């Protein structure tokens, strides 16, 4: 059970990380400081398991993006390939055919656009089309990707993946060594990224990407443990992005409110960017914690 008796020793053991300052980022005029924001998700792949987030065409994507922005999203994350086990692999041309018209439409509406991909060619083309952030879901060694991010003065969400990409079916590290594995990954990647001129990024532990995580309660425990410890990445000096897990095992038909619960845990871990399919259900949690607490005037 998650209780103060569990959380307080964790926070005290890593007090330096908990209190560590992180950089303020500015993306195309929008400032992201050390407080929580939402990254609203639009899935352009029909293979996505989160059916409510799917947009089948440009008008649907634009409608969903506008709605999520009104509901509280600071930025919109779009992807053309699902990371699900049975989802089709989509090549560069296929992804760009789906992504580019949506990027154009969202930019024309004045929205901030993040593109989720693990392919260098897709990322570079998205940046050239005007996307302001790349949500990188793979262990890309090619400096061309990072140089393109730096050249366009764009942002980067640097995701940990146990394998080469979010689609890789590999064993995940044991829960008690997971943070150490992730920390090593990020330190190595940050050296590469910094040398390519990238100076706007979020750290994302990527705990939803492992295809062979255990099912049922063990999966939920694994993800929530990693989520609650994600504040430890603050010691790297960059803001932290986390995805709201759906916890289907627990929520069943009420899965659409799962992200509300996960948002509470994310805020306890001082997350800066909450990647959410359910912006309207998550934003009240952010607002409540913003207006409540010691020092707030009734």
Q: Language-model features: where?
A:
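N-terminal carbohydrate-binding accessory modules
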Residues: 10-37
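Structural preference for beta-strand elements that scaffold enzyme active sites
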Residues: 36-41, 74-77, 112-114, 132-133, ...
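Active-site-adjacent loop and "lid" segments of alpha/beta metabolic enzymes
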Residues: 5, 9, 15-16, 27, ...
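Catalytic domains of carbohydrate-active enzymes, especially glycoside hydrolases
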Residues: 63-79, 266
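Short loop/edge segments at beta-strand edges and connector loops
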Residues: 117
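A general sequence property marking short-to-moderate contiguous segments
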Residues: 1-3
């Amino acid at each position: 059970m998650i209780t103060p008796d569990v959380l307080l020793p964790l926070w005290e053991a890593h007090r330096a990380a908990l209190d560590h300052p992180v950089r303020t980022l500015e993306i195309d005029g929008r400032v992201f400081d050390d407080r929580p924001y939402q990254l609203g998700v639009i899935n352009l792949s029909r293979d996505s398991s989160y059916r409510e987030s799917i947009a089948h065409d440009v008008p649907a994507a634009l409608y969903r993006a506008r709605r999520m922005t009104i509901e509280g999203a600071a930025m919109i994350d779009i992807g053309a390939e699902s990371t699900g086990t049975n989802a089709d692999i989509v090549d560069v041309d296929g992804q760009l055919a789906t992504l580019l018209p949506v990027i154009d439409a969202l930019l024309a509406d004045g929205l901030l656009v993040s593109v989720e991909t693990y392919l260098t060619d897709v990322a570079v083309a998205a940046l050239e089309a005007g996307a302001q952030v790349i949500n990188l879901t793979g262990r890309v060694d090619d400096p061309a990707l990072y140089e393109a991010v730096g050249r366009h003065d764009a942002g980067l969400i640097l995701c940990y993946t146990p394998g080469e990409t979010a689609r890789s079916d590999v064993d995940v590290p044991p829960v008690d060594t997971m943070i150490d594995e992730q920390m090593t990954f990020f330190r190595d990647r940050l050296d590469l990224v910094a040398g390519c001129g990238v100076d706007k990024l979020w750290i994302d532990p990527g705990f939803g990407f492992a295809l062979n995580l255990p099912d049922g309660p063990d999966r939920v425990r694994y993800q929530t443990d990693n989520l609650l410890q994600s504040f430890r990445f603050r010691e790297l000096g960059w803001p932290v992005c986390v995805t709201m897990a759906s916890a289907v095992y627990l929520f069943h038909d009420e899965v659409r409110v799962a992200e509300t619960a996960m948002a509470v845990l994310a805020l306890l871990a001082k997350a800066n960017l909450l990647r959410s399919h359910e912006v309207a259900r998550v934003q009240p949690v952010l607002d409540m914690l913003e207006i409540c607490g010691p020092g707030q005037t009734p």
